Regions:
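N-terminal beta1-alpha1-beta2 submodule of the flavodoxin-like/Rossmannoid cofactor-binding fold
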Residues: 1-76, 83-85, 128, 149-158
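Solvent-exposed loop/turn segments at secondary-structure junctions
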Residues: 11, 36, 81-83, 108-111, ...
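Conserved strand-to-helix beginnings and helix N-cap segments that scaffold or border functional pockets
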Residues: 15-18, 86-89, 115, 141-144
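Short, well-ordered alpha-helices that flank and scaffold nucleotide-derived cofactor binding pockets
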Residues: 19, 23, 91-94, 120
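A generic local structural motif
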Residues: 59-65, 88-94, 115
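Short, conserved loop/helix-junction motifs that constitute active-site signature segments
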Residues: 68, 93-100, 122-125
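Mid-chain, well-packed structural core segment of small domains
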Residues: 79-95, 100-103
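Short, glycine-/small-residue-rich phosphate/pyrophosphate-handling segment
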Residues: 102-146
Length: 158
């Protein structure tokens, strides 16, 4: 059994943290990807993403390239989309039947209550721990706000 960092990242903020966690813990890493990719234009993604989130539209995802049963620890990374988990992550969680999970959430000023969101999406999944990692808004070149030392200290607990 081992660790898996599983993440969804449209603009690479979440991906950068996922890669850091995998590198520092020796975990495997896998990306959650939509069947139909989002456009590359930020404004278009924001419009589509907000519509999906507001209307609770589940975006179909590609089959994962890993077998979740081989891992005793799954670390899920996601950005905040309009105070919620992105539709791709909701699609994953509603079908994954995980007993427990560790969650990290990146945001650019829009917070997410991880416990409430996980109870809403996957009420039978126990959240072992969670971490909120903040970046500057995406409308400018996005930069990490949460100190790396704080992130690394959390990673050491994994």
């Amino acid at each position: 059994m081992g660790k898996l960092v599983l993440y969804f990242s449209e603009f690479r903020n979440t991906e950068s943290i996922a890669r850091r966690i995998a590198e520092k813990t020796g975990a495997d890493i896998c990306k959650i990807e939509p069947v139909e990719p989002y456009p590359e234009n930020l404004q278009e993604v924001m419009e589509i993403g907000q519509n999906e989130t507001d209307n609770e539209i589940m975006r179909p995802i590609k089959q994962l390239e890993v077998d979740l049963s081989k891992y005793d620890k799954v670390i899920l990374g996601m950005p905040t989309w309009w105070y919620h988990a992105p539709p791709c992550v909701e699609s994953f969680l509603k079908n994954a039947a995980l007993e427990k999970i560790t969650v990290f959430v990146t945001n650019s000023g829009i917070p997410l209550n991880v416990d409430d969101e996980m109870k809403r999406i996957s009420p039978d999944t126990y959240v072992e721990s969670s971490e909120i990692i903040e970046f500057t808004p995406l409308v400018e070149p996005s930069r990490l706000v949460t100190p790396l030392e704080e992130i690394d200290a959390w990673i050491e607990t994994l």
